[in-house]
Curated annotation (Swiss-Prot):
Functional note: One of two assembly initiator proteins, it binds directly to the 5'-end of the 23S rRNA, where it nucleates assembly of the 50S subunit.
Taxonomy, superkingdom: Bacteria
Protein name listed in UniProt: Large ribosomal subunit protein uL24
Protein's gene: rplX
Record keywords: Ribonucleoprotein, Ribosomal protein, RNA-binding, rRNA-binding
InterPro entries recorded: Rib_uL2_dom2, Ribosomal_uL24, Ribosomal_uL24_KOW, Translation_prot_SH3-like_sf
Cited HAMAP family: Ribosomal_uL24_B
Length: 105
């Protein structure tokens, strides 16, 4: 089970976008994630009339290393750590280590 998953609310803790809060869009690999509206880079796109692609400069989100983000705790309004424990039915669930509230309801 992963500590950070797709759709989690995260905050950037290092880099040029430090302090920005957003959600995880997808995982690039096991160590890199793409976060919505964070780490945006301008790319120059060549026009391709066969695919109906207009050329120009496009802003895209580039992946961040997973060590540069932390899960965001909305109750404490700050970054938090993730722990694992088993609930009553025996399923493994994630929880915030600072206050013990469950992430996966």
């Amino acid at each position: 089970m992963k500590k950070i998953r797709k759709g989690d609310s995260v905050i950037v803790i290092a880099g040029k976008d430090k302090g920005k809060q957003s959600t995880v869009i997808r995982f690039q690999s096991t160590e890199r994630v793409i976060v919505r509206e964070v780490n945006k880079v301008k790319s120059h796109i060549k026009p391709n009339p066969n695919r109906n692609i207009a050329g120009g400069i496009v802003e895209t989100e580039k992946p961040l290393h997973i060590s540069n983000i932390a899960i965001f705790n909305p109750e404490k309004n700050k970054a938090d750590r993730v722990g694992f424990r088993f609930n009553e039915s025996g399923n493994k669930v994630r929880y915030f280590k600072s206050d013990g509230t469950l992430i996966d309801s």
